[in-house]
Amino acid sequence: MESNVPKRKEPLKSLRIKVISMGNAEVGKSCIIKRYCEKRFVSKYLATIGIDYGVTKVQVRDREIKVNIFDMAGHPFFFEVRNEFYKDTQGVILVYDVGQKDSFDALDSWLAEMKQELGPHGNMENIVFVVCANKIDCSKHRCIDESEGRLWAESRGFLYFETSAQTGEGINEMFQTFYMSIVDLCENGGKRPTANSSASYTKEQADTIRRIRTSKDSWEMLGVRPGASREEVNKAYRKLAVLLHPDKCVAPGSEDAFKAVVNARTALLKNIK
């Protein structure tokens, strides 16, 4: 006679993962980790010397995760120390200070360093990246707005969070989403799940918005040579308008970029006979 007692569900196997932090010195990498793991903020700045290592356990969907965290020093002096720790990583916390443009501009350099150290057989597509726009509590000194940071992250398929290690804002949500994404990666055969947001706009749109942000004048913004004809200006404008119109483009910063293009066209046509 068969028993009607339901079979006991086997507990999911625990996971052991490796996470590293990356970013310039003084952007708050260690403070973010301490805020999450120790529920405290260290106001006195103490630079990380080489590598700080810690272990924490978390629960993700009834699964125990043992997280090995390697907090890497951001100063170039420690390159020879940290370059040994890039391999066999499942997750990367990439941090910049919203009040330091240099730290934001350096994100590409950090990715390049990691790619170089992983070598030709390393695959960064199988690693979960989360970008932390840190120190949002210092709003008076902010120079990188959310749309610019989010665009950089999402166009690469990375997670993006606005954080403050001082107040704790965004920290728990960031780590929870980060760990869930790593579990998804492990359960997906080591392949990073596709971020939904990154599929909603094209690389061309993202690159165009970045170019418009950094343009020095209206000519450069429209992508035409100084002294271009009225017809050339209008042609360039129409192409950009189709690409960036807020009704068609959902990329972060698209509305501001579209307005900038409209203003650039107006300014140029005033001076063209």
Curated annotation (Swiss-Prot):
J domain mapped to chain residues: 217-273
Record-annotated disulphide pairs: none
Q: Which Pfam families match?
A: DnaJ, Ras
Location in the cell reads: Nucleus
Q: Does the keyword GTP-binding apply?
A: yes
Which residues does the annotation say bind GTP?
23-30, 71-75, 134-137
> What SMART domains does the record tag this protein with?
DnaJ, RAB, RAS, RHO
Q: Name one GO biological process term.
A: positive regulation of ERK1 and ERK2 cascade
Gene Ontology CC entries for this record? nucleus
Question: Which molecular function terms from Gene Ontology are attached?
Answer: GTP binding; GTPase activity
CDD domains per the UniProt record, alphabetical: DnaJ (cd06257), RJL (cd04119)
Q: How does it assemble?
A: Interacts directly with MAPK1 (wild-type and kinase-deficient forms). Interacts directly (in GTP-bound form) with MAP2K1 (wild-type and kinase-deficient forms).
Q: Which family does it belong to?
A: Belongs to the small GTPase superfamily. Rab family.
Query: What is the name listed in the Swiss-Prot or TrEMBL entry for this protein?
Result: DnaJ homolog subfamily C member 27
The organism's taxonomic lineage, starting at the top: Eukaryota, Metazoa, Chordata, Craniata, Vertebrata
